[in-house]
């Protein structure tokens, strides 16, 4: 059996995150999502838009997600949380993957990347396209038309065709 792990702030959760979760889940039997806590988001952007409890509740309810876990790290990584997941669950899985969204690229200097390699966890990059951003949503830059256009461009770039007149109902 395989376990996929995704991490992030998810503040707020949007369709780009869901796409990443679906792609990560397609690679594994189970998907764990590490949700950064409010302190992390305070350091990153001043204050969270949604509390970690709200984000956890929404993420746990999503179909591809097996388990949502709040990050226990006190720095700006999820290394301690990854170590804990690996320690507790490694005996249950043949392979563990640490998956990153489409806007992330291989960065051998990132602490999580180095940790994964040392633990035997396989880093996976480029899951999904940058069709939406939490910061775009908060800034009010996403109208339905703009989002439909982004999704349509991604669908077209992948050689797929939408049969619906509108991607959203």
Where are these regions (language model features)?
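Nucleotidyltransferase catalytic core that binds NTPs
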Residues: 1-169
């Amino acid at each position: 059996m395989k376990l996929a792990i995704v991490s992030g702030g998810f503040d707020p959760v949007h369709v780009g995150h869901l796409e990443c979760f679906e792609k990560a889940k397609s690679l594994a039997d189970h998907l764990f999502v590490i949700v950064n806590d409010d302190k992390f988001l305070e350091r990153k952007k001043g204050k969270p838009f949604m509390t970690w409890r709200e984000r956890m509740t929404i993420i746990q309810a999503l179909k591809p997600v097996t388990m949502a876990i709040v990050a226990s790290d006190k720095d700006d990584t999820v290394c301690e949380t990854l170590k804990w997941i690996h320690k507790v669950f490694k005996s249950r899985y043949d392979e563990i993957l640490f998956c990153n969204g489409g806007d992330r690229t291989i960065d051998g200097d990132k602490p999580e990347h180095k940790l994964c390699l040392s633990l035997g966890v396989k880093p996976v990059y480029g899951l999904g396209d940058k069709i939406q951003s939490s910061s775009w949503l908060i800034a009010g830059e996403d109208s339905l038309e703009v989002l439909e256009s982004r999704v349509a461009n991604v669908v077209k770039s992948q050689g797929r065709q939408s049969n619906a007149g509108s991607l959203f109902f």
